[in-house]
């Protein structure tokens, strides 16, 4: 019998991003309780030795999003590309498909976090109560209508500490961007000038 290979999309990710992602997810599961119902699976609970962690994010329609982080994969294109990666799956019953990070963020946003969305315009005109702000801006990246942008400008921005976990932020490419180096100004008094 021949080997049957299964191909998966794995986003190559920096090791420190995975560490940050896992700690943010655990914080919002156990401390802030905003990720209610999420399940964090440790590497020692998984039968696959390449899996570093697995986060199960359930939805109302009995589907779930599974974000799996991998380690010890074969190295990437460059020497500093250590073998760390992330795969994102959406499951409904026995149906499984791969999802891109932006779609995953939209799914999470629609289900879990309070949002100041397009319906806010209509509700504000009707005099109804409007949610004050969007907690998870990564969930909708498109440009809104003029009325939506005006309402958004009216509401003051509040930063969340720590931020909510974003799959798109986890998978963004940092290796191929040029890094800026800080130019330190010399201390003139120390140099004798």
UniProtKB/Swiss-Prot annotation:
Cellular compartment(s): Host cytoplasm; Host cell membrane; Virion
Residue interval(s) of motif HCCH motif: 109-140
Post-translational modification: Processed in virion by the viral protease.
Main localization (coarse): host cell
Taxonomic source organism: Simian immunodeficiency virus (isolate CPZ GAB1)
Induction: Expressed late during infection in a Rev-dependent manner.
Sites bearing Phosphoserine, chain numbering: 145, 166
Additional facts recorded: Vif-defective viruses show catastrophic failure in reverse transcription due to APOBEC-induced mutations that initiate a DNA base repair pathway and compromise the structural integrity of the ssDNA. In the absence of Vif, the virion is morphologically abnormal.
Quaternary structure annotation from Swiss-Prot or TrEMBL: Homomultimer; in vitro and presumably in vivo. Interacts with viral Pr55Gag precursor and host APOBEC3G. The interaction between Vif and APOBEC3G is species-specific, which may play a role in restricting the replication of SIV to their host. Forms an E3 ligase complex by interacting with host CUL5 and elongin BC complex (ELOB and ELOC).
Taxonomic lineage of the native organism: Viruses, Riboviria, Pararnavirae, Artverviricota, Revtraviricetes
Motif (BC-box-like motif): 145-154
Protein name as catalogued: Virion infectivity factor
Domain of life: Viruses
Segments of this protein annotated with the region Multimerization: 152-165
Swiss-Prot/TrEMBL domain comment: The BC-like-box motif mediates the interaction with elongin BC complex. The HCCH motif (H-x(5)-C-x(18)-C-x(5)-H) mediates the interaction with CUL5.
Family statement: Belongs to the primate lentivirus group Vif protein family.
InterPro entries xrefs: Vif
Residue numbers spanned by region Membrane association: 171-172
Gene Ontology process terms (BP): viral life cycle
